[in-house]
């Protein structure tokens, strides 16, 4: 497989040893060239940041370097640090003071990955409307409410990724309360994947009792990859916690 060979070479110099499920997830994102986006939805603690880092590394090596990471503000510095320490990729954090210079048409944007917060993306949406090679959205469950039409941040991110070659959403909880949340996430990067909200509801929400659950699972599996902790415990040593009851004396 061409992508497997390329990744092996790319990761030779990386300061990280990806686990098999992380490589699988990265390959899933890279081997879907006709999809505008994917969701990497591994459970908490399985290294979705590493998976995205591998994808970014591949794009970087191909000199497709117009890359944007949208993340909670508290994680911006961590992303910058991990990209450089683990993958030797430089990144810079966008803020209101630097945005005009960094996003100016003549600026050599390809010298570093750009990182911004969700708040920044919402406030400065117009400045971020461009032909990105890759957009990564971390903690993307923040975008699940896109289906309601009331999520301003989700709407802004959807507009931003509209011009991207590929979008990668990272979230451990793609679904929490309503099936429509799945529709909301996928529609961030592909508004027509489920045709329309009405069509989705008719087929999958109302039709769940008619046995359409398998069909929905198949449709979602085409755009989403999820590994559970129990599937990864053979090569990740999780801390085992045992509750102990101690009597007060």
Task: Place the predicted regions along the sequence by residue.
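Charged, low-complexity
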Residues: 1-38, 111-113, 118-119, 133
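Walker A/P-loop NTP-binding motif
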Residues: 30-31, 49-63
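Walker A/P-loop
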Residues: 35-55
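Conserved Walker A/P-loop ATP-binding site and its immediately adjacent core
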Residues: 64-85, 179
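Conserved helix-turn-beta segment of the N-terminal RecA-like "Helicase ATP-binding" lobe
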Residues: 75-99, 193
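Inter-Walker segment of RecA-like/P-loop motor cores
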Residues: 89-120
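Inter-lobe coupling linker of SF2 helicases/translocases
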Residues: 110, 114-131, 148-165, 188-249
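Conserved helicase ATPase motor motifs in RecA-like P-loop NTPase domains
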Residues: 164-178
């Amino acid at each position: 497989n061409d992508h497997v060979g390329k990744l092996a070479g790319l990761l030779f110099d990386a300061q990280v040893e990806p686990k098999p499920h992380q490589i699988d997830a990265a390959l899933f994102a890279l081997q879907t060239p006709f999809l505008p986006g994917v969701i990497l939805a591994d459970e908490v603690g399985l290294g979705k940041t590493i998976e995205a880092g591998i994808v970014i590394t591949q794009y970087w090596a191909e000199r497709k370097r117009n890359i944007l990471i949208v993340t909670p503000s508290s994680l911006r510095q961590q992303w910058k640090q991990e990209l450089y320490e683990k993958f030797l990729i430089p990144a810079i954090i966008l803020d209101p003071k630097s945005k005009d210079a960094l996003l100016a048409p003549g600026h050599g944007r390809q010298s570093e990955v750009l990182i911004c917060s969700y708040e920044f993306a919402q406030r400065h949406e117009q400045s971020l409307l461009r032909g990105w090679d890759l957009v990564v959205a971390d903690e993307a469950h923040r975008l699940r409410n896109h289906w309601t039409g009331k999520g301003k941040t989700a709407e802004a991110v959807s507009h931003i990724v509209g011009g991207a070659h590929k979008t990668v959403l990272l979230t451990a909880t793609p679904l929490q309360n309503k099936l429509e949340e799945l529709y909301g996430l996928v529609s961030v990067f592909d508004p027509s994947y489920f045709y329309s909200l009405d069509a989705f509801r008719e087929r999958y929400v109302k039709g769940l009792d008619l046995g359409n659950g398998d069909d929905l699972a198949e449709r979602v599996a085409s755009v989403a990859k999820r590994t559970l902790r129990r599937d990864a415990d053979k090569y990740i040593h999780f801390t085992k916690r045992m509750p102990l009851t101690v009597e007060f004396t």
